[in-house]
């Protein structure tokens, strides 16, 4: 009997121990589940909103005049390099931009500049590396564009420019690779086009240009590749055509030109390809014709009115 009681007590103790272990296991499992649930909640919780990245752009700075503008440009290039964005400068008060980037390495962004009050852009990009986008510029008040792109790398789109107020286009594209579309330009107020395309790659259409107010066409296409139609040009007010087509490839029809007011035709076709008919030109008595056809196809058979 004692043995049976002992056996029952052992089984009872074992059962109690098993129950205790099971409870602990259950509690442990519950705790683990709670931890996992908490971890899951933390994981699935909405992340905190990331802060927007700060921009490196500068606040708009107003340039009071040309000198102020030049200082701002110099400081910006020194800080950010020659390809920097200068659109943060408000240039709407500036009226003179002559020589602004003359001999400069600058080739950054000035596409959004408001140049609507500028009157002088002479030498602005002369001998510079600039070839940026200025297609949307409002140049309607600019009067002087002399040497604006002379010997520069510029070859951008300026086909939509309103140049109706321009008077001086001397050497504007001289020595450049520019060959863009300027066919629709209103050049009716220009009086000086001397050397405008000299030493250039230009061979665009300018057949419809109104050049009736131009007085100086000296060296206009000298040493250029130009050979397009100029037959309809009204050159009745031109006084100087010296060297106009010298050393050029021009050989178009200019037989009906009214050159009665021209006083200087010296070197006009010297070393050029020109071999057209200009026999009906009416030239003034006191005109300078020195070396007009020298080393050209017409040298041996010049017009009858020609006098060395």
Language-model segment annotations:
Residues 2-13, 17-30, 35-36, 40-308:
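Negatively charged
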